[in-house]
A protein has these predicted regions:
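Catalytic histidine-centered segment of alpha/beta-hydrolase-like enzymes
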Residues: 201-211
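Acidic catalytic loop of the alpha/beta-hydrolase fold
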Residues: 148-149, 172-177
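Conserved alpha/beta-hydrolase catalytic His-Asp/Glu region
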Residues: 84-90, 100-162
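Short beta-strand/loop motif that positions the catalytic acidic residue
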Residues: 162, 168-170, 174
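Flexible "cap/lid" loop of the alpha/beta hydrolase fold
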Residues: 57-65, 72-104
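Short alpha-helix in the alpha/beta-hydrolase fold that links the catalytic acid
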Residues: 155-156, 164, 178-187
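Active-site loop/oxyanion-hole signature of alpha/beta-hydrolase fold enzymes
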Residues: 3, 9-50
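Catalytic nucleophile loop
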Residues: 51, 55-56
């Protein structure tokens, strides 16, 4: 995008990448306020927000909290349109963290290759994920994020009733966020959206078919 003349800002959300692993509840509101704080500190008046996977939930929440900042919403393989069985107890215990690490850490990096339709074209992607496992608090962040999910229909109806343009982009072979499971629901809550399917791609269509995506 930057090569095509766009001004682009990307960030690692709390608990991801090189951002701080907070000892806090990892809610959509926490992430949204992180984005809002960055926008306001940079004195940016309006932004086009792109949210990938769980990032789709985050940009929806930004639009809920600060709609005046949002010029467009672009959802890429967003996980935010599914019905969620909300957790009653949202706290994360040390046992849950230890169990998660023991059960998932040996294979979690290799599992990232399942995001692709053609993982053989992305050798080494799993190695990059290994770096995240080195940071204290990463497992807790993943668990807390999942526990704080809820069904976002109210927010999406609010967005539908606003003047914010909405775009949804999907890989045609995404096995992580399966479009067929919520196809009818998204049509009911966001009928004005413009929708695109990227051919020959899984959960990361911008990486597998960048020519069509761009």
């Amino acid at each position: 995008l930057s090569e095509n003349g766009y001004s682009v800002i990307s960030l690692d959300l709390y608990g991801r990448g090189f951002s701080q692993n907070l000892n806090d509840d990892y809610t959509d509101e926490l992430f949204a306020n992180q984005v809002i704080d960055l926008i306001e500190n940079l004195d940016i008046k309006s932004v086009k927000l792109v949210g990938l996977s769980n990032g789709g939930r985050v940009i929806s929440k930004v639009a809920d909290l600060k709609p005046e900042l949002v010029d467009k919403l672009i959802y890429v393989a967003s996980s935010g349109f599914r019905v969620v069985n909300e957790a009653i107890n949202k706290k994360v215990s040390k046992k849950e963290v230890n169990d998660f690490i023991e059960k998932n850490y040996p294979t979690i990096s290799k599992g990232q290759l399942a995001d692709f339709k053609y993982p053989e074209n992305h050798i080494g992607w799993d190695v990059k994920y290994e770096d995240l496992l080195k940071y204290k608090g990463f497992a807790r962040a993943l668990i807390s994020t999942r526990k704080n999910h809820y069904t976002m229909d109210r927010i999406h109806v609010k967005i539908q009733n606003s003047d914010i343009p909405v775009y949804t982009i999907w890989g045609d072979s995404d096995n992580v966020v399966v479009y067929k499971k919520f196809e009818k629901r998204i049509e009911l809550i966001l009928p004005k959206r413009k929708e695109f399917f990227i051919l020959e791609s899984g959960h990361l269509p911008h990486m597998e078919n960048p020519i069509q995506f761009n």
